[in-house]
Amino acid sequence: KQAESMSAALRDEMGIAKAFMDLYSRMAADPALLASATMNLWMEQAQLWQSSWMKMLGMPAAPVAEPAKGDWRFKDEEWSKSFLFDYIKQSYLIAAKHLHATLGHVAGLDEHTARKVDFYTRQYIDALAPTNFVLTNPEVLRETIASSGQNLLKGFNNLLDDLARGGGELRVS
């Protein structure tokens, strides 16, 4: 059964790998786009670094990146109050913005492939949000300390229940 699952995963039935291979080949054909995107990312990260140092030294510093209106993931005040969590949040937002913008400006993709790349890029970006990880989420850290880790145990037990219901596979609905 495991070999069948591996084989199915390698078949790329949804054409995800093919879509990204097309994207990457078009990006390679336009090195100026890639160089410009990389330079813009570096410049914004440098601004964040400078702003973060100012904040750490107690000086006023405007945020370089802010969550989109309605983005509930960073609602906890610790995301703005804490130097470290503010830096993590803004660094993620900058990287996410640049990745999405860069991949969205690659010329020559057909509409179906462009939509597929956009969808899976958003999934990837959202999956890597610092809110999804224990050590980079102040709310989860606070609850973990307050509950002596019981929140993590409960989450792990929920995962095991989901796997059992799915016959050993995680079925997200």
Where in the sequence are the language-model features?
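Amphipathic, low-complexity, repeat-rich surface-exposed segments
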Residues: 1-173
